[in-house]
Curated annotation (Swiss-Prot):
This is Phosphoribosylformylglycinamidine cyclo-ligase. InterPro entries: PurM-like_C_dom, PurM-like_C_sf, PurM-like_N, PurM-like_N_sf, PurM_cligase. Coiled coil: none annotated. It comes from Escherichia coli O127:H6 (strain E2348/69 / EPEC). The keyword Ion transport does not apply. It comes from the Bacteria. Keywords: ATP-binding, Cytoplasm, Ligase, Nucleotide-binding, Purine biosynthesis. Its EC number is 6.3.3.1. It is found in: Cytoplasm. One of its GO terms (cellular component) is cytosol. One of its GO terms (molecular function) is phosphoribosylformylglycinamidine cyclo-ligase activity. It holds the Pfam family AIRS. HAMAP family: AIRS.
Amino acid sequence: MTDKTSLSYKDAGVDIDAGNALVGRIKGVVKKTRRPEVMGGLGGFGALCALPQKYREPVLVSGTDGVGTKLRLAMDLKRHDTIGIDLVAMCVNDLVVQGAEPLFFLDYYATGKLDVDTASAVISGIAEGCLQSGCSLVGGETAEMPGMYHGEDYDVAGFCVGVVEKSEIIDGSKVSDGDVLIALGSSGPHSNGYSLVRKILEVSGCDPQTTELDGKPLADHLLAPTRIYVKSVLELIEKVDVHAIAHLTGGGFWENIPRVLPDNTRAVIDESSWQWPEVFNWLQTAGNVERHEMYRTFNCGVGMIIALPAPEVDKALALLNANGENAWKIGIIKASDSEQRVVIE
């Protein structure tokens, strides 16, 4: 009788010990994100979170997202420490535009072969994003799936739940003719348009690590973490009558602003009110990208646009800039029955 080799899960490419080592590595940073409403710790089958008692009619708001092919660029450049911030930002910024306070966040990390150092760097970034937005990292899934991903390549996804008072939901229904639009400056391309970014790098033959732009490597501009606006916007909502907020993500100006506009209104954007950050000028020139396409693909230096009554503008700008935002008046809402919901002039 022939002896057969006894196979293990590790022989199949799944290292449970590495997974346990990762959990041990990240416990400390995850604990720092804990909110008082969270019950229990890491390791349970599910995460428990009570609703904050200050809400009379709490409405839960949820969102899920990834970071697109910015992740491919981060992997190629072996820079994993801020991609987790991007992941959180894409989710929590979508929640806060509806007036919601983020409560808790969960992540999904999938890879062909688990590298504990890489995964720890990514999840530490997620924890940092949670700290910046005031939400708890309550759990996640780390999936080692040999044969599904090439080597140590990985993908991440995030899921966030927040809460808003029912009477204070921001849905754009109050937007009206004469409202003023305020812009919040972005930190760069954030997490959108990176398939085009990578194509431009390929066609131009540019090495982002050696190409200098504004005194630092182009890679620093391209991998700058997505700005998290949660705390500034939540304070603004408390003190100013905000009618609508648009998060400029995939689809840029043309697709995201109309999502918060009522019928028979249009947003008129004053292009002279700001200058594009140099990274967008570089992308447009290196890729010979038409201006309309730039506004459809990238945020061009504008991370969020806020609509509010004209009398509130000065107060809003003072508050936002005092909180470290780069905020300015970017346009106005006008009555219109045109199918073109956004005009940039």
